Every structure is written in structure tokens, then in C-alpha cells.
């Protein structure tokens, strides 16, 4: 914790429960790899960003020279997924972190524009990628005005024009976002 600007430290034995299990290094690395793969669903077989060791199953992606590892549970869940769900990804989402993987699997070149000069921005200061099913379809440029208690949607940038059903799905997700944030949605 902190006390003003000073960090406070504590001994591990006073923070963690006494009956916590202890693992050897190999077992701890294996468990960490499984946890990483479960979180990501898919990872490069040998990746410096998300090392998963031998967790999951080896997978070959058509057209890719790289080998991947997949979480079998995530793979099985795809069978039950009707697809088409819309999600706004936080610009710092782990899915966006490995840019080469993102470009290879989704053909999506992502650039966080908050550090670009305003004149060079294409989508907005903190635009959120819009994932629809298994493809990136646009960017949401929105911000919360806490003083007004409102979600302001500056723009929805469509990579290709949305059909009416896709437009309705994105609008519904924006409404859900405003509700989740506990603010009203300004007309856009």
C-alpha cells in the first residue's frame, strides 16, 4: 500500500496464508503457462510475450508459417458459440498486445493513437477496437464525462459499412456500455 507518497512494505508471511501450497519451479512454470494460455485462448508456440511452454495443444493456422498453442477448453467453446457477438476492446487488452499475432490471425494492424499528435490521429485519442465475432470491424471513439454523467460517442469508425443488423448490434453494445458505466448515453 501507500501512505501519501511513501510505499508501505510487508513481509510475505504476514500477507499470504500459511497453508498456501508450495510448488517447485517446473510445476509453477507449467501452471503459469496453462493460466496464460487459458487467458489468451491462443498463443505462439515460442513467444516472448506470452510464454506458455507445452500447455494446451499444438495448432497449425492455415497460411501461417508459425506454430501456435491453443487452449482445448477455448477451442471446445467455439462449437457452442453462435458467433457475431460485439465487444469493445480496451486499448490495453492482452489480445492487442502481440501486434504480429494480431495482424497474422485477424489481419488487423492496431495503433494506439493516444501518443500521436492530434493531427495524425485517424480514429481518436483512446479509440477502442470493435470485435464482431471473429473479425475487427471498426473503432469506437467515446469518452465518459463524469461531471455530466454521460457517455459521449464521438465517432464509430467502420472499416467497411455496417449492414443494418451489424449497426444495431454495435448500437446495442454502446447502450450496454453506458449502462455498465452507470451513465446516460448522449445521442450520436
Annotate the PLM regions.
Residues 1-188:
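Long, charged, low-complexity, helical-prone intrinsically disordered regions
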